[in-house]
């Protein structure tokens, strides 16, 4: 009788464990952020993945990665999660908001600001506290990109495998300057 009870409890435990487990993500969180795979990001969230994990490349977080690749739906999802650090900086001193500002990604800027990202945070890792507002004042409203900055865009695009559209970036930065002054 005792053995039947133990077997019954064990069987119930196994069945409950199997039924209650959620499927695991099939790709890493950075690839999911890069490709805009909201379903996989949700699996990472449900599975308890570290949403502030650092990538080998520049110590980017999944939020910064999603921003770099223009994945606003992933940015929205991650920015709504408890514990996600909206103002986390990579080794270059960039936050997700800094990245969105530099690349002129107005929708992502609006998403991050609505979620509470700090638009006055120190950016670029310099001593002059060049936050996104300063970044847009220096770069955002320019009608063109100077050769030094253009080279930085080219280098970053190559590093991350991005297509580079300087006209779109310039247009977006002008809008970013307006959004960050509100």
Where are these regions (language model features)?
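Bacterial N-terminal signal peptides
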Residues: 8-17
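Start-of-repeat signature of ankyrin repeats
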Residues: 58-59, 93, 126, 134
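Ankyrin-repeat-protein effector appendages
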Residues: 19-28, 132-182
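Conserved ankyrin/ankyrin-like repeat signature
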Residues: 40, 73-74, 107-108, 149, ...
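Ankyrin repeat boundary signal
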Residues: 53-55, 86-89, 119-123
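Ankyrin repeat domain, specifically the short helix-to-loop turn at the C-terminus of the second helix
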Residues: 43-50, 76-85, 110-118, 156, ...
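N-terminal segments that cap or nucleate solenoid repeat domains
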Residues: 24-58, 65
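Ankyrin repeat A-helix N-terminal signature
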Residues: 31-36, 65-71, 99-105, 131-149
């Amino acid at each position: 009788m005792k053995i039947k009870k133990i077997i019954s409890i064990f069987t119930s435990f196994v069945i409950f464990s199997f039924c209650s487990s959620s499927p695991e993500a099939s790709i890493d969180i950075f690839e999911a952020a890069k490709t805009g795979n909201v379903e996989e990001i949700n699996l990472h969230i449900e599975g308890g993945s570290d949403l502030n994990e650092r990538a080998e490349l520049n110590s980017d977080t999944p939020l910064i990665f999603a921003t770099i690749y223009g994945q606003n739906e992933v940015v929205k999802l991650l920015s709504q999660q408890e514990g996600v650090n909206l103002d986390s900086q990579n080794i270059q001193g960039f936050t997700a908001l800094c990245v969105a500002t530099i690349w002129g990604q107005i929708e992502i800027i609006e998403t991050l600001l609505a979620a509470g990202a700090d638009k006055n945070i120190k950016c670029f890792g310099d001593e002059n506290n060049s936050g996104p507002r300063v970044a847009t004042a220096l770069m955002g409203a320019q009608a063109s990109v100077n050769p030094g900055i253009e080279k930085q865009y080219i280098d970053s695009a190559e590093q991350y495998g991005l297509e580079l559209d300087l006209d779109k970036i310039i247009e977006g930065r002008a809008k970013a300057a307006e959004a960050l002054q509100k």
